[in-house]
A protein has these predicted regions:
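Structured alpha/beta or helical-core interaction and ligand-binding surfaces enriched in interleaved
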Residues: 1-108
């Protein structure tokens, strides 16, 4: 998938800075080529839970942000993230005291 198309699918208006940021995240994400499609699928599946995949501004990772308005929707979003991680062998890092995960990459 082209970087412009990926940024648009994630809800960004592509520009040079975002393309460079996405490129740095791709290089930092272990086995990125194996999980790219699954990251985009997860983004689509999480929308109904007020959750999404985004570019982290503080680290070169994709982040999964859960902003669900109810505990039930939040729980469902966390379950989807867990399923994604287990099914596609994706290593995640949950941020302490936040509804956020970093996608570290493919874990063999």
């Amino acid at each position: 998938m082209q970087r412009d198309a990926m940024l648009i699918q994630l809800g960004y208006a592509p520009n040079e800075a975002l393309i460079n940021q996405l490129e740095a995240i791709e290089k930092n994400t272990l086995g990125y080529e194996k999980i790219q499609k699954h990251i985009m699928d997860l983004h689509d599946h999480l929308k109904v839970n007020n959750a999404y995949v985004a570019l982290s501004n503080s680290n070169n990772y994709f982040k999964i942000k859960i902003e669900s308005p109810t505990p039930e929707l939040a729980l469902e979003a966390h379950e989807k993230v867990k399923h994604f991680s287990e099914k596609f062998k994706v290593s995640l890092k949950k941020l302490q005291n936040k509804e956020t995960y970093y996608i570290e990459g493919f874990s063999h």
